[in-house]
Swiss-Prot record:
Name of the protein described by the UniProt record: Interferon alpha-4
Biological processes per GO annotation: adaptive immune response; B cell activation involved in immune response; cellular response to virus; defense response to virus; humoral immune response; natural killer cell activation involved in immune response; response to exogenous dsRNA; response to virus
Alphabetical keyword list: Antiviral defense, Cytokine, Disulfide bond, Secreted, Signal
Compartments in which it is found: Secreted
């Protein structure tokens, strides 16, 4: 067991170093993954959103954190990473597993996981290039609070199918904002 864990860690470190040494072209690699995630999320819809209009909720998406004009690239990547991490966490719960068709949920989670790996490699590279703090704490906190509100909503609604549908639509909206941030980053390069 200890040997296999050590081997796994060695492979992970080597692959991480090779990813980082290739350079970070986040806007191209990440935006394709983001589009695939959006398509999968759209396919996951099980019920008509019209039947859930009474359950709509304003989660207070932190749009200003995805403006992109005030960020250096490393900070913007850190915000994107936090959003994808929180989305991954939300859809990795047991309650989420019961709400969605399993194969689509697995594909969606795999796509998010790949994006996290890409973003982590880019964060490491960009911090080294720009020598800026790893992340903008206020922005990261705003994203975390946003996801806390989503989780609280699901809990209050007892993870009902309509609650999950509202959350699915909200996550699609937030992923769209991240796509727009990526476009702005591409223009800055």
């Amino acid at each position: 067991m200890a040997l296999s864990f050590s081997l796994l860690m060695a492979v992970l470190v080597l692959s991480y170093k090779s990813i980082c040494s290739l350079g970070c072209d986040l806007p191209q690699t990440h935006s394709l993954g983001n589009r695939r995630a959006l398509i999968l999320l759209a396919q996951m819809g099980r019920i008509s959103h019209f039947s859930c209009l009474k359950d709509r909720h304003d989660f207070g998406f932190p749009e200003e954190e995805f403006d992109g004009h005030q960020f250096q690239k490393a900070q913007a990547i850190s915000v994107l990473h936090e959003m994808i991490q929180q989305t991954f966490n939300l859809f990795s719960t047991e309650d989420s597993s019961a709400a969605w068709e399993q194969s689509l949920l697995e594909k969606f989670s795999t796509e998010l996981y790949q994006q996290l790996n890409d973003l982590e490699a880019c964060v490491i590279q960009e911090v080294g290039v720009e020598e800026t703090p790893l992340m903008n704490e206020d922005s990261i906190l705003a994203v975390r609070k946003y996801f806390q509100r989503i989780t609280l909503y699901l809990t209050e609604k007892k993870y009902s199918p309509c609650a999950w549908e509202v959350v699915r639509a909200e996550i699609m909206r937030s992923l769209s904002f991240s796509t727009n941030l990526q476009k702005r980053l591409r223009r800055k390069d």
